[in-house]
């Protein structure tokens, strides 16, 4: 049992390292292609591990707050994961792009997709047009709704702990 536990721990550490490396590579790609200026994010690499691209897409949503697609290549196809923001239905967007996709499925905030490598740029352009048309500048800002204002002088360990427990 201990041996199995150690193996699982090692696999988890490797997954975290791969996740971190892939996320860093995706951020570099976004900056290099100036995707921060777009209404959506689409990043891809031939050798990213398909088991972590959904996690990477979620991390990119946290950082850039745009509908995000992360793709990796398998033979002549890109397979990937889409994540969305409040107010934008990623499944409906993929459905509108279905003429260039081999497969897709999912729901409003998360989906999977597969497309031929020859259709990548066409898909990228179609998806960006959809997001640009349906997402306002206000939607590109991750907002938080709060119940009350607290002054700095009201904060102490007990109140912060209580607030953390209720979140």
Predicted regions located by residue number:
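Short amphipathic alpha-helices in soluble, non-transmembrane regions
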Residues: 94-97, 126-130
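A common structural junction motif
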Residues: 99-102, 130-136
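Conserved short beta-strand edge segments in small beta-sheet-based binding/regulatory domains
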Residues: 104-107, 137-141
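Upstream accessory/linker segments immediately N-terminal to the RecA-like ATPase cores of bacterial MutS
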Residues: 140-147, 157
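Short, low-order "capping/linker" segments at domain edges
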Residues: 156-162
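Conserved small/polar residues in nucleotide/adenosyl-binding loops
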Residues: 163-167
């Amino acid at each position: 049992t201990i041996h199995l536990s150690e193996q699982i721990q090692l696999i988890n550490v490797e997954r975290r390292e791969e996740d971190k490396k892939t996320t860093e590579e995706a951020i570099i790609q976004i900056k290099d292609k100036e995707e921060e200026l777009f209404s959506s994010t689409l990043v891809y690499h031939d050798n990213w591990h398909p088991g972590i691209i959904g996690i990477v897409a979620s991390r990119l949503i946290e950082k850039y707050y745009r509908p995000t697609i992360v793709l990796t290549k398998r033979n002549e196809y890109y397979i990937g994961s889409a994540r969305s923001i409040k107010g934008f239905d990623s499944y409906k967007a993929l459905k509108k792009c279905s003429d260039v996709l081999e497969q897709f499925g999912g729901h409003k905030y998360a989906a999977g997709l597969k497309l031929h490598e020859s259709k990548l740029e066409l898909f990228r352009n179609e998806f960006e047009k959809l997001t640009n048309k349906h997402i306002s500048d206000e939607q590109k800002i991750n907002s938080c709704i709060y119940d009350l204002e607290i002054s700095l002088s009201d904060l102490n360990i007990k109140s912060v702990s209580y607030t953390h427990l209720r979140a």
